[in-house]
């Protein structure tokens, strides 16, 4: 990153096209390739087929540069029947490398801006801010005191050109934007990369990083309204364009529609100091201490605002108003509830004593077992009832590879669901994976499960006892002799940057 700082000089006012040359640098694609191979894979390693792709990076870059200097560069035949070719090469392989390189390039200015922000705030551990688990301690602290919550399902995918226009306000590099527009328009399966799927979005596995970046960037843009409302709730006065994250035209639209009317009559609706908002991909939660009437006003305001100013078609039925006391939040693979915890207090006076019953609110996070079994069933580890099955497609692997794959799946699930209040659901998942592993090995060796386990011994169990569990018991076993208290111990980690594939059952 220091090399990027020296090359880019971090001065966009003097250098507006610093991103464009990076697209034709080989080390950018090598960096993207290494990121792809080193990412956390929960089910199986799918990167072996790409090990030789670095050998053709130079050929790809040379071809792109050659096309740029031709008069008919980037011209495609409209009646070309070969839809599996891209710039004369295989679509899957080259598009994966191109979009991987694009993802690295477009993330550079945003990452540098984040570093400057953290330096100004004297925060050096930026990686801690990326952890998904960091959301849940925030929910524990804030949501216990709130009343209503809005479950928001983000609108259907937007038009490609709107994404490009939104990106223009941050990346002032016309050449890069034109090249990006070309690749996205010419990519033959663009419409299948971002498609509505229940309450979330489905992305191409190969190009997931790049399209997640574009999607999250656009969503963050229309989330900037919360910055505006947060400032207005604390002081009713004119605000600078910086509050709108450099959206000058956006600021003018708001100024014409809002500030020219009776300002106080409109803004009082949003003077709510207890308003909290969290989002992950296609699902968001907006919680408040206000009344049901206030939440309804929030609901229809957001729908109209997103449709009018960001062309995000959203229907009111995609936003549900629920009361936290009798509603469970389905968010990030956890089932979160706010329950009343009874508490008896004994008050002693001079001659008399009183027992006072009191109840406090507590935010609980649980692992939903039914959707998790559904995910395991889709992956062919068990049937819909949760009965373990063998994995025939893995029977051709070696015994050590089979055991390692099953063990890796459980270790990742155990790591992700370490914050669950009750571990019984996790123990059931452990049982399913262990028996599925045993049946897969028995199927491979044409034996019964009982005979195979008797011959294998305890070696199979070691892969399913995670390092986190060992540290967990060594740390807390001495501090608490009550097994029930140890059973409900929750641990949040700061190194989880993506939701587990099996946990993403939406």
Swiss-Prot record:
Primary site of residence:
plastid
Q: Does the keyword Transmembrane helix apply?
A: no
Compartments where located: Plastid, Chloroplast
Which cellular components does GO assign to this protein? Answer: chloroplast
Entry annotated with the keyword Transferase: no
GO MF annotations, alphabetized: RNA binding
The record's Pfam families line, in alphabetical order, gives:
Intron_maturas2 (PF01348), MatK_N (PF01824)
Keywords on record = Chloroplast, mRNA processing, Plastid, RNA-binding, tRNA processing
Listed under GO biological process in this entry are: mRNA processing; RNA splicing; tRNA processing
Give the signal peptide as a residue range, or say none if absent. Answer: none
In the record, the note on similarity to other proteins reads:
Belongs to the intron maturase 2 family. MatK subfamily.
Q: What job does this protein perform? A: Usually encoded in the trnK tRNA gene intron. Probably assists in splicing its own and other chloroplast group II introns.
The name under which this protein is listed is Maturase K
Q: Which organism is it from?
A: Rhododendron hippophaeoides
């Amino acid at each position: 990153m220091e090399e990027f700082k020296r090359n880019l000089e971090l001065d966009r006012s003097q250098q507006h096209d610093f991103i464009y040359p990076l697209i034709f640098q080989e080390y950018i694609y090598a960096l993207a390739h290494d990121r792809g191979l080193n990412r956390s894979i929960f089910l199986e390693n799918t990167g072996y087929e790409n090990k030789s792709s670095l050998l053709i990076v130079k050929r790809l870059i040379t071809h792109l540069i050659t096309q740029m200097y031709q008069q008919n560069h980037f011209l495609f035949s409209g009646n070309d029947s070969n839809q599996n070719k891209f710039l004369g090469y295989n679509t899957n392989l080259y598009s994966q490398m191109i979009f991987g390189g694009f993802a690295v390039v477009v993330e550079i200015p945003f990452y540098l801006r984040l570093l400057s922000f953290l330096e100004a705030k004297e925060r050096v551990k930026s990686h801690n801010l990326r952890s998904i688990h960091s959301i849940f301690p925030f929910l524990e602290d804030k949501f216990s005191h709130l009343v209503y919550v809005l479950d928001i399902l983000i609108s259907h995918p937007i038009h490609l050109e709107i994404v490009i226009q939104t990106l223009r306000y941050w990346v002032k590099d016309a050449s890069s934007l034109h090249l990006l527009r070309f690749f996205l328009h010419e990519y033959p399966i663009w419409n299948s990369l971002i498609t509505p799927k229940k309450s979330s979005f489905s992305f191409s596995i190969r190009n997931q990083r790049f399209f997640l970046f574009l999607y999250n960037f656009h969503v963050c843009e229309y989330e900037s309204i919360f910055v505006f409302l947060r400032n207005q709730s604390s002081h009713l006065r004119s605000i600078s364009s910086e509050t709108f994250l450099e959206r000058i035209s956006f600021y003018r639209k708001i100024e014409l529609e809002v500030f020219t009317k009776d300002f106080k009559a409109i803004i009082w609706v949003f003077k709510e100091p207890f308003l909290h908002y969290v989002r992950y991909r296609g699902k968001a939660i907006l919680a408040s201490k206000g009344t049901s009437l206030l939440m309804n006003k929030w609901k229809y305001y957001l729908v109209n605002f997103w449709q009018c100013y960001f062309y995000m078609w959203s229907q009111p039925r995609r936003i549900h108003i629920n009361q936290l006391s009798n509603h469970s939040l389905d968010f990030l693979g956890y089932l979160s509830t706010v329950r009343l915890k009874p508490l008896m207090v004994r008050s002693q006076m001079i001659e008399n004593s009183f027992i006072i019953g009191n109840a406090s609110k507590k935010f609980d996070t649980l692992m939903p077992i039914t959707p998790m079994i559904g995910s395991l069933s889709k992956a062919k580890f068990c049937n819909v009832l949760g009965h373990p099955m063998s994995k025939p497609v893995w029977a051709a692997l070696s015994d050590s590879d089979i055991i390692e794959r099953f063990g890796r799946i459980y270790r990742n699930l155990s790591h992700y669901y370490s914050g669950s209040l009750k571990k019984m659901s996790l123990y059931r998942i452990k049982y399913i994976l262990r028996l599925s592993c045993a049946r897969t090995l028995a199927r491979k060796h044409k034996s019964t499960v009982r005979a195979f386990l008797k011959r294998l011994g305890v070696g199979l169990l070691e892969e399913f006892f995670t390092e986190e569990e060992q540290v967990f018991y060594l740390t807390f076993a001495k501090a608490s002799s009550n097994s029930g208290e140890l059973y409900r111990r929750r641990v949040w980690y700061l190194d989880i940057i993506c939701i587990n594939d099996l946990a993403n059952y939406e």
